[in-house]
């Protein structure tokens, strides 16, 4: 008798991610792949958002086992003539939480050499862990030039998400991908496409429904 092969599972919880993570605690077998909301997406001034952001990074690191990893996609912003480096903020908060950087890659949002206005033309992809040691050689380019389709204006590209989830699966050995700010569900859908279970959290009811329904095919990755 042939064995039945079950499809990967997906849980999407409609909730505020901060109290949800505090209550849930560590998720066995999980690796986090996420993108924290920008100040423009939350009802806070810049100073309060900075504090919130740093605390959220620490909660994400706490949500996965020490030997696992947390991966962050973050795009810098400009405010009042100053550059807000979210990559530096992730590193600072992760180190304060007892983690260290495994790698820091760049995802191109625009073709290299093109002038950009407003938002920078690249996104940080940073992996951190408390105990994991990163392999010397990774099947992951330093600059990801094709991020893939964006399923939502604020979503990460599906190919970029695929790179992150493959790292979680092949290098970390994760069984579950956790995205506490899952939006319309790019990361959970990519995780399922690559054979992993996924847990997502999203405050918006509409985006929760989209996240539960979104399908990404392996051909898109």
Mark where each language-model region is.
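Conserved SAM-binding loop
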Residues: 211-212
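Conserved phosphoryl-transfer catalytic core
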Residues: 216, 221
